[in-house]
Structures are given as C-alpha cells and as structure tokens.
C-alpha cells in the first residue's frame, strides 16, 4: 500500500535540479498552490524573452528582478544562459551563498557579481536579481530609474502585479499549474487524492 506525498513539484524541465517522475500510488497527497483553472503557466523561454526584450527596449534602465534565493534564482540564471544571454548578471548579497553552492555542484550559471562590490547608480541595462522583499526597501533606491519585475506564478494575477507595483511580471513557477496537477493525478492513478495548499472550492 503506497502513499505518495508530493511536496512542491513542477513537470517542466529545470537544469538546476532533478526532473519529475511519475510514481504509481494508492493515495496521492498533492500540493495545489495553483490549483485553479485560471493558472496555466506560459513557457519559461517566452517569459525570459520578455525580460530580454525589455532590456533592449529600456536600454538605459537597470532591471531589478525579484527571485527567491533557493531554486528560483539559479533557475533564472540557467534560463538566461540557455537563451544566449552571456553578460554579467548581478546578484543581491542574499543570493550569493546558495548560488555559490549550486556552482560547486556543477550548475552552469555563467558570470555573476555581488552588487555590494559595485557603484549601483552606474548600472544601466543590466539584470540584477534580488529577493522580492528587496524591490521596495532601501537597497533598491540605490538604482537609477529601474524596471522592477518579479518571477512568480502569482504574476498571473493582475491585482498582485498592481499591489506590488511591478512593471515586468514574469510567470515562471516552481509549482505545477492546474493542467499539470490534473495530469499528474491521472498518471499516478491513485484510489484516493488529498490536496494541500489549494482552494477548497477547486
């Protein structure tokens, strides 16, 4: 008798971590952070393209992009390199330690620099990754006329974008969307499904 507890999962490829695999089970306990039909994540490469196009269009403005320190930061670095972006990417100090660990494990992220080593007011069309909370604190005010973005599945919700005063919402998530939750449940073929982190009405 097998019980499978999913934890957070996604089915899309991510070169910075092990891939998803199906496991047949009798009871499947799945997370459902984005367990509503309105959540259908776009392709990662299309969201990265939006970021790169914004850099070209707003070539005198630094791009401050909010990412979580564990996993999301390194995934975005990897996706940017896969998209052909080979410029130095700047990281808030809070992102450096975990990123250095990923590098020590062989994850390819290209050239990065700690923003604490720089005169940030001189940065123009560069990409600067930081924790989401840093977008609106004292640290962010050191940049001149930045474009602010957040990388999150929640950027699918206009109210969230407006609430956080974000100019560049990027919908890249480490959680399965509605369709992938349904597909995973079907493929695991459990007798019973229990759901966490979701909306009861779903």
What is each stretch, according to the model?
Residues 1-71, 82:
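His/Asp/Glu-rich metal-coordinating catalytic cores
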Residues 1-18, 50, 58, 67, ...:
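Core dinuclear metal-dependent hydrolase active-site scaffold
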Residues 7-9, 32-34, 70, 94-95, ...:
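Active-site metal-binding loops of divalent metal-dependent hydrolases
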Residues 14-16, 38-40, 97-105, 123, ...:
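Short, charged, surface-exposed secondary-structure boundary motifs
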Residues 27, 61-64, 88, 125-128, ...:
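Residue-level preference for the first positions of well-ordered beta-strands
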Residues 48-61, 67-125:
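Hard-cation-handling environments
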Residues 143-174:
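Mobile, glycine- and charge-enriched loop segments
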Residues 184-195:
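Proline-aspartate-enriched helix->loop->beta-strand connector
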């Amino acid at each position: 008798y097998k019980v499978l507890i999913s934890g957070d999962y996604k089915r899309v490829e991510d070169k910075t971590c092990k891939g998803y695999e199906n496991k047949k089970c009798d009871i499947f306990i799945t997370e459902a952070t984005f367990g509503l039909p309105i959540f259908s994540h776009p392709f990662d490469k299309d969201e990265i393209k939006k970021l790169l196009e914004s850099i070209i269009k707003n070539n005198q403005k630094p791009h401050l992009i909010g990412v979580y320190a564990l996993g999301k930061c390194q995934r975005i670095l990897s996706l940017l390199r896969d998209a052909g972006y080979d410029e130095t990417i700047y990281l808030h100090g809070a992102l450096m330690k975990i990123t250095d660990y990923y590098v020590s494990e062989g994850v390819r992220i290209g050239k990065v620099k700690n923003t604490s080593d720089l005169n940030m007011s001189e940065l123009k069309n560069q990409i600067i990754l930081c924790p989401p909370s840093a977008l609106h604190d004292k640290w962010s005010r050191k940049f001149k006329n930045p474009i602010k973005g957040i990388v999150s599945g929640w950027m699918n919700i206009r109210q969230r974008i407006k609430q956080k005063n974000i100019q560049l919402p990027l919908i890249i998530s480490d959680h399965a969307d509605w369709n992938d939750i349904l597909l995973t449940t079907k493929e695991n073929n459990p007798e019973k499904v229990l759901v966490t982190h979701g909306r009861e009405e779903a």
